[in-house]
Design a protein with these regions (language model features):
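N-terminal Rossmann-like NAD(P)+-binding domain of SDR-like oxidoreductases, especially those catalyzing
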Residues: 1-178
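Short alpha-helical
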Residues: 11, 89, 187, 249-250
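Short aromatic-enriched loop/helix-cap "lid" or pocket-rim segments at secondary-structure transitions
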Residues: 32, 39-42, 136-139, 187-190, ...
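Solvent-exposed, non-membrane alpha-helical residues enriched in polar/charged side chains
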Residues: 71, 113, 164, 194-198, ...
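Short-chain dehydrogenase/reductase
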Residues: 94, 180-181, 240-243
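A general structural signal for well-ordered alpha-helical segments in protein cores
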Residues: 109, 160, 193-194, 251, ...
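NAD(P)-dependent short-chain dehydrogenase/reductase
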Residues: 138, 149-151, 161-215, 220-229, ...
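C-terminal substrate-binding subdomain of Rossmann-fold SDR/epimerase-dehydratase oxidoreductases
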Residues: 200-321
Length: 321
């Protein structure tokens, strides 16, 4: 099968590409190789180089999904499937620059959908977010009413509706993925787990915004497995899937676990960040039944793996915190 992965050098993206390569699929990647200022360019260059080492046979196009290059790639390769992972990396970046966020998350998505329609792609897998739910408690299903808070979640939900509309018009089938708090080796520095881990390793203060706020932390290997299944399993057509560990852990618990694993760092409790919804664990029964999805890595093992990677990488240094 010929598959295009947008954002294929991202944290989840390069793990998806590795799995597709291992299964013998012909893969192409389009990636603009930026995190929109989340981390210094030198650190991003290191992460991209390390991710590329794990990819053996895929074609790489360094370009934006808003560029004409995307349509050229689709014309040249005649893809069966597009896995659309390219996006702004997190809510605070979109809130700080909503116009640029909309350019990537909406204009870029429309560019993909139009090229998919024009070049007869059979399936588009759209990576959405658990942020579309807004506030929710444990065991939220894909059929829950979505009330996103903030522009990131709103745009992700609008993206879902756009994808569904192209399917309604007979252009291609789709699968929609709602992941949560994905982490693991080769992640960037500005997400919860990576920030906690590096701060602890540098002997700093882990600032916990809302001790009892919970997240459904998901190890990157599990997330990648679910996305690949959604791209390949015929029964996934036109369905939405929560792809997470389906287990909520409080921010305080996560910080305490990391401090214990690293044997360094201290914890400071702060008020909840008002810009972020309160979240719990997602129900993954549909993904289990349809995709055979079975997440393997619990938080304790995942944090251990992540710490081991940091210790052996050139990414971290004992900076002043």
């Amino acid at each position: 099968m010929k598959i295009l992965v947008t954002g294929g050098l991202g944290l989840i993206g390069h793990n998806v590409v590795r799995r597709l390569e291992a299964q013998g699929h012909k893969v192409a990647i389009i990636d603009n190789m930026t995190t929109y200022g989340m981390i210094p360019q030198s650190e991003l260059d290191y992460l991209i180089a390390e991710r590329q080492k794990k990819i053996t046979g895929s074609l790489l196009y360094s370009a934006s999904i808003t560029s004409d290059t995307l349509d050229y790639i689709c014309y040249r390769h005649k893809f069966d499937t597009i896995i659309h992972m390219a996006s702004f990396p997190r809510q605070k970046v979109v809130n700080a620059n909503p116009t640029l966020g909309a350019d990537t998350m909406m204009t870029g998505l429309l560019n993909i959908l139009e090229s998919a329609k024009k070049h007869h792609v059979k399936r588009v897998v759209y990576i959405s977010s658990s942020m579309v739910y807004g506030d929710f408690e444990d065991d939220v299903t894909e059929d829950a009413v979505c009330r996103p808070q903030g522009q990131y979640g709103i745009m992700k939900l609008a993206g879902e509706d756009l994808v569904k509309d192209y399917t309604r018009r007979g252009c291609f089938d789709h699968a929609i993925i709602r992941p949560s708090a994905v982490y693991g080796p080769l992640d960037v520095e500005d997400r919860v787990v990576s920030k906690f881990m590096l701060t602890a390793m540098r002997g700093g203060v882990l600032r916990v915004n809302g001790a009892n706020e919970t997240l459904d932390f998901t190890y990157v290997d599990d997330a990648a497995d679910g996305i690949v299944a959604a791209a390949l399993v015929p029964a996934a057509a036109n369905q939405t899937f929560n792809i997470t560990k389906s287990h909520s852990v409080s921010l305080l618990q996560a910080a305490e676990m990391i401090v214990k694993i690293v044997a360094n760092g201290t914890i400071e409790l702060r008020d909840k960040d008002a810009d972020f919804p309160s979240r719990g664990a997602l129900n993954i029964d549909r993904a289990r039944a349809v995709l055979g999805y079975d997440p393997q890595v619990d938080v304790a093992e995942g944090f251990d793996n992540y710490h081991a990677w940091f210790k052996n990488s050139l990414y971290w240094a004992p900076k002043t915190v």
